[in-house]
Regions:
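C-terminal catalytic-base region of ester-bond hydrolases, centering on the histidine
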Residues: 221-301
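Composition-driven, intrinsically disordered low-complexity tracts enriched in small residues
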Residues: 23-42, 172, 177-194, 269-273, ...
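Short N-terminal helix/helix-N-cap motif within the alpha/beta-hydrolase-1
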Residues: 73-75, 101, 175
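The feature captures the conserved acid-bearing segment of alpha/beta-hydrolase catalytic domains
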Residues: 199-236
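Serine-dependent carboxylesterase/thioesterase catalytic core
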Residues: 67, 91, 114-214
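Catalytic nucleophile-loop/oxyanion-hole region of alpha/beta-hydrolase
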Residues: 103-119
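Flexible, membrane-associating and regulatory peripheral segments of lipid-active enzymes
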Residues: 1-87, 291-301
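Conserved alpha/beta-hydrolase
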Residues: 83-103
């Protein structure tokens, strides 16, 4: 029933669509209702996982999209994946972190984060081998913006990744209430909490995992970091816990760009202002200047 209501809300509300400038371009739909209604987690989002794609001189590094806790590549990247593809990037996405059978019902990102980082490591190696690119760029939402830091710091990823962009990443943890809210949003998520969701416990402020991750500094040399966050994040709380410290970090608060952006944690992948910031982080020589238009919680726009 929730999925029916979600789809209906997209029909009754304005589902922002970027007009395709060329016939070959993929539609980019900035709507959380549209995106989160996708129920085929194994299906690659539009534009992703073309293993014949070769990077260009303009965009020499493939982009790997990393979803968050309880989510999957299909429901997370229905906007950003085609947007990147339309703008000339080779785009790849994965599902990771199945635990205690969670992947069987389409719930990912619940397993131990160290193991998820190993899955990401193997996937990036596969992408680099297929594309011939020595380095990749990573874009992640929620846990997907934080987990790659373990790969960069402890698994040799610093020599394989140029840029990490986090959308509301749980870099310094959150509260039990924040994780619980997230679990209730995704169908089946509430079945995989507590002991059935090691990643949930590891993202709580004060966990041993976070202490190890952040010991010795937030970043590693040679990697560029961008954090994009909303003041209205109700999952990563306080919202400032997403931000990183370091000379190679750019922290962006969306409301400093647009006071009409009321987007929350769930709307981040479907927020056209946040997604424009992603493009700028990946290609800083060609900065984007998105229009300041209303962005709604959960829905985006």
């Amino acid at each position: 029933m929730r999925r029916v209501l979600v789809v209906l809300s997209c029909v009754l509300s304005f589902c922002a669509v970027v007009a395709a400038p060329a016939a070959a371009d993929l539609p980019v739909i900035y709507s959380g209702a549209y995106g989160y209604a996708h129920t085929t987690p194994a299906a690659s989002p539009p534009g992703a996982n073309d293993w014949t794609c070769k990077p260009t001189a303009a965009h020499p590094r493939p982009v790997v999209l990393v979803h968050g806790t309880f989510a999957d590549m299909s429901n997370s990247w229905q906007a950003l994946s085609p947007l990147l593809k339309n703008n000339g990037w080779c785009v790849f996405a994965l599902n990771y972190g199945s635990y205690a059978g969670s992947g069987a019902i389409g719930v990912y990102g619940t397993g131990e984060i160290r193991n998820s980082a190993k899955e990401l490591d193997a996937f990036v190696d596969k992408v680099r081998a297929a594309t011939g690119a020595p380095e990749a760029d990573l874009v992640g939402h929620s846990q997907g913006g934080m987990m790659p830091r373990w790969y960069l710091k402890f698994l040799g990823g610093a020599s394989e990744v140029h840029t990490l962009v986090g959308l509301s990443p749980s870099n310094h943890g959150t509260t039990v209430d924040g994780i619980g809210l997230l679990a209730r949003f995704f169908p089946g998520g509430s079945q995989f909490t507590g002991a059935l969701c090691p990643a949930c416990e590891e993202q709580i402020v004060g966990s041993q995992f976070l202490a190890e991750l952040n010991s010795g500094g937030d970043t590693v040399p040679g990697v560029e970091y961008t954090v994009i966050q909303t003041r209205y994040d109700q999952v990563v709380t306080p919202y400032t816990s997403a931000f990183l410290s370091g000379s190679n970090v750019k922290n962006i608060l969306l409301q400093n760009q647009c006071i009409l952006d009321l987007g929350d944690h769930l709307s981040m992948p479907y927020d056209h202002i946040a997604d424009a910031d992603v493009l700028t982080a990946l290609d800083p020589l060609h900065p984007r200047n998105p229009l300041c238009t209303p962005i709604l919680p959960t829905e985006g726009g």
